[in-house]
């Protein structure tokens, strides 16, 4: 019996795969647990429609990620920290970078950063993982605060 998998099933296939299984396995295991549906014209059309929409979403996200990469690489964020005896008092963290990026119109998320970032004085380049194979380098400059002590 040919069925379309509704979920990933170990040793059988992934979601939306068309597989051939024994009748008893399909009737007594896959169908009651809603892991698969019988292969019909309608289920095949639904599968094709879903896969087409999924591909469209993928293409849109890929295009948006390339636009975001261009914006990120053209932007430099500036921060200032208080200093004590020439050393930074505190550090710049991921959350502060994300907040300032949002004010400049960049939609950064915490998962884009490889590690938690803690920056002291100087020029820094942070590699961001935006989408599958798309990475961007964000430039951050941290300077001493020139305010009155």
From Swiss-Prot:
Keywords: Ribonucleoprotein, Ribosomal protein, RNA-binding, rRNA-binding. The keyword RNA-binding applies. SUPFAM superfamilies: L9 N-domain-like, Ribosomal protein L9 C-domain. GO terms for biological process: translation. It comes from the Bacteria. The lineage of its organism: Bacteria, Bacillati, Mycoplasmatota, Mycoplasmoidales, Mycoplasmoidaceae. GO terms for cellular component: ribonucleoprotein complex; ribosome. This is Large ribosomal subunit protein bL9. GO terms for molecular function: rRNA binding; structural constituent of ribosome. Belongs to the bacterial ribosomal protein bL9 family. Binds to the 23S rRNA. The keyword Secreted does not apply. The gene is rplI.
């Amino acid at each position: 019996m040919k069925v379309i998998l509704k979920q990933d099933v170990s040793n059988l296939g992934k979601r939306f795969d068309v597989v051939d299984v024994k009748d008893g396995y399909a009737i007594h295991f896959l169908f009651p647990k809603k892991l698969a549906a019988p292969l019909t014209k309608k289920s095949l059309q639904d599968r094709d429609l879903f896969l087409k929409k999924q591909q469209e979403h993928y293409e849109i996200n890929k295009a948006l990620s390339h636009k975001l990469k261009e914006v990120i690489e053209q932007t430099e964020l500036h921060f200032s920290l208080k200093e004590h005896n020439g050393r930074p008092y505190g550090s710049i963290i991921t959350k502060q970078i994300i907040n300032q990026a949002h004010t400049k119109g960049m939609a950064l998320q915490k998962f884009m950063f490889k590690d938690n970032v803690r920056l002291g004085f100087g020029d820094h380049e942070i590699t961001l993982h935006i989408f599958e194979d798309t990475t961007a380098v964000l430039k951050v400059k941290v300077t001493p605060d020139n305010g009155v002590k």
